[in-house]
Every structure is written in structure tokens, then in C-alpha cells.
């Protein structure tokens, strides 16, 4: 899965049962964490400060209290200034309330470091989704733009392995979801390169499952795809998580619970795929605009304002880097040379930045990079200086 080791935004954890552990001194102190069960018992309103994530272990709630608890919790989550990762931790036999739409439903045996990594992954995914929606709203669609095969198609689930439970996975999926089977990891990667899948289930013996997951995760196109692994022994759960599983299904799962977990993974996978598609589309469009003199100042200003407001709701700042040649000690002697230098600077910034960072040419401004964190500006500055030191422009 994505290698994410730092939070996109920091804050307290809201938790019921399982309390995520911290791994960085930069995290909010533990005494700011919110025990949801305690707040529910007191009938209190939750703080307005945006949490880093919300984690609810369903076993911490007595059966008869669950509906009341979620009736109290969900409206308060909805009223938060921005969406945050929301997790339900469960087991094979737990009964999950209907109507929940968490970011993910995960086996409660997930190791602490994997849970933290998933929080990091999902935080970034939410930022990418916000960025995709913003670009579509500000820049619109590109007429006739074709999508990459792994972004195209209807909502689909890929089942990898020869367990003989293919019909069970079809039965557990929503009616409109197409379920496709693959014998092994190589076949899975081949299928995934030709059409979109929103989630993968690996239903194979432990050693094969690890091998198949690693084949999938090695391909950068599928690093963020939800992958659910099936196992028979509880002692294998942690190993599968650490080898790339987004969730692990152990033993016989209650049919309704299995459907909840599968559909949650599919929902997140589809959302991520659509965001990837829009970001890829806008990337091509922004590159095309270079030949037309760049993005208009009015469009760019509207983007900056909307993006800044969205990040501020999460306590984040927007970092704009003007990439004019003079900022790097370069002097252009002609308009043709200036165009070449701008192209070089944009190419360096494009290769160094993330998909959710905006890199473009703006009319009257020149090349710019709009980054979502300060570390990105330092990294980009160093990269540009390093390349320019060894490049004759």
C-alpha cells in the first residue's frame, strides 16, 4: 500500500475502545484525546477541534447501546469543518449497525503501526479527493480526454486465488458491482492494468497471499488500492497487515458483516480512483495550457482562495512557490531562452511534487508550484538547486 509515515494534519484522536498510539513528538498530546464512550455516557457535545481520526471498536459498545451511540455520534461527525478518517474496528462475528459509512472497517487485531499508517494514507486520500473536486469545479473537464485503463470502467471487485469461494464474494458484493476472478498475482496485475478495480480480495493460502499482495503493491498504480486478505489462523492476521493488507478477514465471517467490510473497501477504492482520474486529467490540461501562455490569473486566484480556505479548515497552510528564473539566479537573454528555462523549472517541479500539488504556468506570473505542506517547498527548492547546479541552461 502507499508508504505514508506522517500525518497530513495533526489533532486529537476520538476513540471508543481502541486508542491509536502516537509515533511522533509533533502529534497532539494524549490528554487532548476524546473518549467517545465517556462523552456519550455524559450526553456531552464533542469538541469542535478537528480530530486526526475517529476510531470505534464495536466491541466497546454493548449491543443495545450501539444504535443510540451512533445516533449521537454521526451528526457530530457530519458537522465537523472537514471530513476526517473514521474507522470501525470489528471481528468476524460482530454485528454492525446499518447506515454507517466509515472510511474503512478493519479487523481489530490490526497492529498499532499499521493503524497509524492507514490513518496517514486515508488523510492524504481525503486531501486528494478535495483537490480533485476543487480542480473539477475551477478548471472544468477536458473535452475528449481519455482515461488510463486502470482508471476506466464500472465499479468492480477482483478476487485473487483458487479457494472456490468466488460465489460467496459475488453474494457479499452489492448488486451493481462486477466481480472478476484471477488465479494468481501475475494474472491480477495484468487484469488491473487493463481496467479499473475498486478493491481486491486475496483468498489464498498464507504464503501465496503474501506473494500476491507484494506483486500488486510493487506496481505504483495500485499502491493505494484497498486489498483485503483472507486467512484461517488468527496468528497470521498481523503478518498479513504488515505485508500490505488494508483489512484481514479471518475464519468464517457473518454474511452481513462481510458485506459491510467489502462495501466499505469498495466505496473508498472508487472514491480514490475517481480522484486519481481527475488529477491525471487536470495534469494533462495544465501541461497543455503552457502552449497557450499559461493559466489565467483569475482562474489561478480563484483556485488559490478556495484551496487555502479548504486547507485552513484542517489547520493547514498553503505554500506557493514562484518559480521565476531570477529567483534561482538565472537570467534569460531572450524570450525563447525564458521559455526553455520555464519549461525546465516546471518539469523539475512536476517530477518532485505530488499529484495533489498544483504545478503550472500562470500568465503574467510565470511558473508556480502550490504545495500542501512546508516540507514540500524545502524538498522542491533543494531539488531545483541540485539539478540547476549540474545543468547548462
Predicted regions and their residues:
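Short amphipathic alpha-helix used as the core "switch/output" element in two-component signaling
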Residues: 63-82, 210-223
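Acidic, metal-coordinating helix/loop segments flanking the phosphotransfer/catalytic sites
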Residues: 34-53, 61-62, 183-199
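Short regulatory alpha-helical coupling segments
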Residues: 290-317, 347-351
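Alpha4 helix (beta4-alpha4-beta5 surface) of REC/receiver domains from two-component response regulators
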Residues: 66-72, 91-105, 211, 232-248
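Conserved helix-loop-beta segment at the catalytic/binding core of cyclic-nucleotide signaling proteins
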Residues: 327-329, 342-377
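Non-catalytic signal-transmission and effector/linker regions of two-component phosphorelay proteins
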Residues: 1-35, 40, 44-52, 75-82, ...
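Catalytic-site or vestigial catalytic-site microsegments of nucleotide-handling domains
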Residues: 163, 298, 302, 313-336, ...
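Receiver (REC) domain switch/output surface
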Residues: 101-102, 113-143, 257-272, 278, ...
